[in-house]
Each structure stands twice: as C-alpha cells, then as structure tokens.
C-alpha cells in the first residue's frame, strides 16, 4: 500500500486525514508514458544459482573442468573424446553452437554477482549445469594452492618436476560414480599392490579418462611412466580457452593410481601398460599453462638450438610411417626419367627417410 498526503485545492480541507490507495490502483492511474521496469521471470534461475555457487566455491576447478570439456568437444575425434556425451544434447552441432554463445566463466561470474540473469540463453545455462553441476557431482576438480605443491610431492613420495606446473588439481569422485566405487573396492582388497604412475597426454583425452567407464575398450591402453619429466615430454601442447586463467596453450600430466596385477612392463621397468580401466583412477592433474607469446618464444629457442631436431624426433617416433613415406618417395622417383635433377634429389631424400626409419 502507498500513502498519499491530503490535497490543498479549493473545496478540500488541508487537514484531511491521509487516504490509502493500493499499488495496483496507482499503477493504473499513471500515464502510459511512464514506464516501470518490471523484469520478467528468469527461466532456469535455480540452475544459475547452482552454477554461481560452484564458481564461488572453486573458480579454478570449474574453469579447468570447463576447459577439459571444450577441448574434447572441439576435437575432430569427439566421438571417442567426448564420452559420456552430455545427456541433454542430441547432436554435436548443437553443442558447438551453444559453446559459441557461452561467455567466459570470469565474465559469467561477474554477471551473476550483479544479478544479471538474462545474459545467458537457456541452452548455455543447460550446458553449464550439465558440466559444472551434474557432471561435477560424479567427478570434480579441486584446485591446490601453490604453497601446497611441495606437500603434495612429499605425500606422493615423488621428486618435484624440473618444470613446475602452473596448477595442480585433485580429482574427487562423488556418490553414484560406479567406476570410482568399483576401484575403491578393488583398492581396499589389494592395498599392497597399489602403485603410482604418470601419464602425459593432450588435453582432449582427459575428459574421457576422468568420466568414461569404457575409456580403454577396443584394444586401447595407457602407458604409464615412473618419471614425471618423461611424461611431460610426451604431453603435446594444445590450445585452451582464450582468456582462461589456466593458460592459452596447455599441457597435461595425470597422476594415476593403479592396482598392479601382473601388468606388462618395459625391460627397464619404467613403463607399465594399463589395459583395464577399472584397475586405475586419476588422482591428480598437473596443468602446464603458457601464453601464446611464451609458447612461441620457447619453440623458437628450441628450433635455433637444434634446427633438425623436429624432423628427427618425428622419424624416431613414427618409424613405420617414415618407412612408408620413404618407400613412396622411392616409387615416385623411379617413375620419372633418370636424368631429372629434381627426381634425383627426391630419390636421395626418400632413401634417407627410408634408412632413418629402418634404423
């Protein structure tokens, strides 16, 4: 109710008692030119509050989880990387369009702090809820402070890596995670066989590694190493999310706990092959983030120090492909006239690649 004072016009006493009029009646009496800011009811308001709470609890953990999801979704191998596929989405095209409309999490947090609940479309809210709330109830990431890194190394019984990570996240499994419950039961029965290993990989592989129960189907396996520096060398850099606190160029090393059950090992016992996903669990994630300028400078320094190292690394790592390439170049060169200087050079190159592949 609104209180209106008495009028002083002719015929109306100035000491008339105040008259009450309802708010609805007052709005009806106002001219149409005076607009009132009546905000519509925001859909998915409860979901936005849940997302806001997760961002407030651990912003870095949410951003890492969102970055890992985006890396898997944008991969051309999304069919194997994005597992399980978000339940409310039918096609990858719809996921792409929604990711294109989604704001940066830092911007979203500022909008929610100022009670701006109209900035995100319903699809964006639904996807944020799926990844940061529903999916995080099963597997979530908890960020560690830099001062806790040394304590973690001592707890795991490992030497600090030569290149310190920019962020470390503890992987936590929630209730209803069947994979986590199965591993916890196996771990309890085989406490003396529990081991730790390191797995360096591209960021797009981490989503399925954390969430999928069938990540090692169809003959797939993980090759773990006991040296974290070697694992980091195997991790290929991948573009992250622009403006992310995790970094623009990211490399990832997973600290994997597993139950040793007569697994295959290398001759020097430094690598272990894991073929059953139920016998392992990712305990921590180490992220190495760089800006684009830092990555370009590092790459330029490596190329200046060893100009041909990239080609030699490729030949050593993919010797089978090198043999195929060398044979192909030899065949192509043999089809031309022997007097051609170009094809002579091509033949010599093919023979060199072929020789390196065999060696």
Swiss-Prot record:
Cytoplasmic compartment residues: 1-324
Membrane-crossing residue ranges in chain numbering: 325-347
Reactions it catalyzes: L-aspartyl-[protein] + NAD(+) = 4-O-(ADP-D-ribosyl)-L-aspartyl-[protein] + nicotinamide; L-lysyl-[protein] + NAD(+) = N(6)-(ADP-D-ribosyl)-L-lysyl-[protein] + nicotinamide + H(+); L-glutamyl-[protein] + NAD(+) = 5-O-(ADP-D-ribosyl)-L-glutamyl-[protein] + nicotinamide
Subcellular location: Endoplasmic reticulum membrane
BP GO annotations: endoplasmic reticulum unfolded protein response
Organism domain of life: Eukaryota
Effect recorded for residue 199 to A: Abolishes Sec body formation
Lumenal topological domain: 348-359
Keywords: Endoplasmic reticulum, Glycosyltransferase, Membrane, NAD, Nucleotidyltransferase, Stress response, Transferase, Transmembrane, Transmembrane helix
Binding-site residues, NAD(+): 199, 221
Disulphide bridges, residue numbers: none
UniProt keyword Nucleotide-binding present: no
Listed GO CC annotations: endoplasmic reticulum membrane; endoplasmic reticulum tubular network; nuclear envelope
Record's bilayer topology term: Single-pass type IV membrane protein
Alphabetized GO MF terms: kinase binding; NAD+ poly-ADP-ribosyltransferase activity; NAD+-protein mono-ADP-ribosyltransferase activity; NAD+-protein-aspartate ADP-ribosyltransferase activity; NAD+-protein-glutamate ADP-ribosyltransferase activity; NAD+-protein-lysine ADP-ribosyltransferase activity; nucleotidyltransferase activity; protein serine/threonine kinase activator activity
Record-listed E.C. numbers: 2.4.2.-
Location, primary (coarse class): endoplasmic reticulum
Reported function: Intracellular mono-ADP-ribosyltransferase that may play a role in different processes through the mono-ADP-ribosylation of proteins involved in those processes. Required for amino acid starvation-induced mono-ADP-ribosylation and subsequent formation of Sec bodies - which are stress assemblies that promote cell survival by preserving components of the ER exit sites (ERES) during amino-acid starvation. Catalyzes the mono-ADP-ribosylation of Sec16 which is essential for Sec body formation.
Domain notes: The lumenal and transmembrane domains are necessary for mono-ADP-ribosylation and Sec body formation.
Family in the record: Belongs to the ARTD/PARP family.
Protein name: Protein mono-ADP-ribosyltransferase Parp16
Naturally occurring in which organism (per UniProt): Drosophila melanogaster (Fruit fly)
